[in-house]
Amino acid sequence: MIEVAFAQLRLAASLALGLPFSPRSLNRIIDSLQATRCEFGAIERSGAELVQGPTLDPASLREIHLRRFRSQARRAAKETAYYSDLFGRLGLDPARLSWEDVERIPFTPKSALRERPDDFVRRGARPTLNCTTTGTTGRPTNVCFSDYEMQTYIAFNAMGHLVSGDLGESDILHIATSTRAVLGNICAIGAAQRVGALVLMGGLLEPAQTLTLLAQERSIPGKKARTSALLAYPSYLGELVESGRQLGYKPADFGLERIFVGGELATTGLMARAQALFGEVTFHEGYGMTETWPCNGTVCEAGHLHFEPSSALIEVCDLETGAAVKPGEVGRMVVTPLPPYRETTLLLRYDTEDLVQTLGEPPTCRLRHLPAFSRLLGKRRLAVQCDAGWVYPRQVLEALEALDCAPLPARCGFWAVAGGVAVEVVARDRTATTRRQIENTLEEQGAPLRELYVHTERSQLRQPLPLRGDLKELSFSGAGGAQTVDRRSAPHVEDEYAEPMLISTF
């Protein structure tokens, strides 16, 4: 008991003062949370505060952010090639930065990290893992992490699962993400194993193969009869829904209870159509990117994207001027990962290119104590400025994925034309009824539609939005791998499947 109390004090000191985390203390806290959940079945609010830190008023949080930013800026100016040169040119003392000085520091563009990744690695760091992004929306970038950082991320993920109860010892978690998404996969696998769940790293197989694995009955002692949790990109989840529909699957064929989605925009229509296939599953929608890890967000029941404030300074800046936006306005997320979470690849005011809308009113949701914005609107370079204003990928995707006439995931593109935007989309047919449905839903989402091109083949698209689900991987066939079953033609067949051997094509 004394050791656990000391570990809690050690964690509180790290969260409050920015001191390095103690891996031993984090592990003791995880053990304590596991014991509490086993005995009482749930973690009280005090347990959540232990992981997130105490709720701070805006003034106190702003003071802490400035102090942590100075600390990170000092290390960056002293120990990285990129920021040493930058602060020299700006003539700023990183130890004495004011908020006005912070605003003078230019955004760190993705292009700089992509072209000179080693210039951001701190000379005093001990990197042990070099992660690349998947490169879905551009050439991959490289980010280095230390063993301390990885242990910390896994520990906090595990504590998050234990506090929320969204993953436990009896669960079977199927991960359907690209095997190139090393950072997210390592953290997801490590945290799941730490809470005792069984992990199956499926990767991005052909959807029919993944459906077979999800429907497979298991008889592992202490585990549920079927896969109970799925981690997937929204676009790949859409492919699973579409394939499941074609193969005749029903909710009774699965045991899914929770679906974790991230890496792309998840729409209301996608989740509703996924529930039609898998049953009344609970969705956990998150946000995270390799460059700014562990600045990860979660979407609440009211549709707000919330962030734990101690891990990073998040600014929402105007698309044109770069100044801070006003409440209710749209801007780009500019993120500075802070100590004690980041010590290897240091990034100050990193331009994520992700667009959000600030909230016009204080939230009243379950996570109202955490900073929040709207759900992601999409990448800046994928948004379109037209005569009628900005049109964002979320508007188009929310409209299309709500329609059954548009196969999942929505295959589409859009661009500016006189008076608004032109939209192209793959649909099941090109009838007048389909066109009217698409036109109406786009207008309901506020898209100033002027031209609509309805196709029935992906190859006909001129400017398609990129999808992570297209980063497909291959498996050996005919060697004990999972076989695809059409539930309509063979409803009574009982099959045994082995886990597939993966070959990455990237």
What are the residue ranges of the model-derived segments?
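Nucleotide 5′-phosphate-binding alpha/beta core
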Residues: 1-132, 138-152, 156-159, 163, ...
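Conserved AMP-binding/adenylate-forming
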Residues: 257, 266-268, 272-362
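AMP-binding/adenylate-forming
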Residues: 147-160, 172-238
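Phosphate-coordination loops involved in phosphoryl transfer and adenosine-cofactor binding
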Residues: 169-170, 256
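AMP-binding/adenylate-forming catalytic core of the ANL superfamily
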Residues: 230, 341-450, 504-505
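Short, well-ordered beta-strand segments
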Residues: 174-175, 334, 424
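Adenylate-forming
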Residues: 209-210, 217, 223-271, 284-291
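Conserved S/T- and glycine-rich ATP-binding loop of Class I adenylate-forming
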Residues: 76, 133-136, 173, 230, ...
